[in-house]
Amino acid sequence: MVKLVEPILPLAPWASPIIDIYAESLLACDQLEKLDELLLNMNNGKDSFRLLAVKIERAHISNDYKRAIELSELAISKYGLSCFYWAQLLRANYSENIELNKIQNVVSKIPKEIIKSFSFNGLNLLHLVAKSDLSLAESVAMEWFIDDPVGMATNVTNLHFNNLKRNNDLTKNVYPSERCSTAFVYTKRGRTYTKLLVDDCNSSEYLLNPDSPLGELLSDMDIGEEAKEGMSTIKLIEKLPAIVGAFRISINIRDDINPGDDCFYSLSINEEDGVEGMLKQIDSISQQKQTISLLF
């Protein structure tokens, strides 16, 4: 691509699709001197979406994080609804070791509509948000999970495990869901279920409508209580915060749908087996030289 474009490159290039591709190719090929020359010759203030991304990445390569912040802010002024550029702004702020309260201020300005629905750029943004406001990241992930439990299971568990050591008290902000406030763990006919109580949802294996007979019954029960539901007896085991329920269900789904190429394992430990039983399971899996996720 580089050799094809160079013979027809004007002395004063302007932003265009072909220049976007050329600049990206120079960056990918690590031809930074040529890239710098191109960007210098194009110093006319008319940058495309893709060219701004190249400039930001070039600033990161040079460890010029202040410049990366400036360019990211410029990009957001043009493309304020871009998850990609909000992620770039957070990335640059973290790289520059900006004070936490200033980063949290940036996070507070992210338009909520751009993370209302799942997108891959939105997911990348969410992982960066989690570094300064884990509660916000978790609340968004839970909403995405409600929309698509199976499709979001891996992403939700990854977010959880990536932030196990993160201090959830970095902010005092609370982001309650408008449609889900709790989750139930209950047994029925010898099987244990974990379900989110979600307003106006179609009840499924993972979600339960509070206006359904079972939803109303569980809402009125105390932990440990048993009640008749049709021909069956149900027992309420736990009432969980919604986000905890979403993580637990995600763990179960990810384990169930694992086709064998996901280095993820869910260990079920019987109380009677104790620590010895747990160690035997860990030893069996560790011999396969794969990553283990210990879930309790």
Q: Where are the model-predicted features located?
A:
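Generic helix N-cap/helix-start motif at coil->alpha-helix transitions
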Residues: 11-20, 44-53, 78-87, 114-122, ...
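Glycine- and charge-enriched low-complexity intrinsically disordered segments
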Residues: 226-231, 251-296
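Structural register within alpha-helical repeat arrays
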Residues: 21-22, 54-58, 88-91, 123-128
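Extended boundary segments
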Residues: 149-193
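Alpha-helical repeat scaffolds
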Residues: 1-10, 31-44, 65-77, 99-112, ...
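Hydrophobic/aromatic side-chain positions at a characteristic register within alpha-helices
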Residues: 27, 60, 94-95, 129
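Short, structured beta-strand/loop micro-motifs enriched in basic residues and often containing a Trp
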Residues: 202-215
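Short, well-ordered loop/turn sites that connect or cap secondary structure elements
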Residues: 177, 218-221, 227
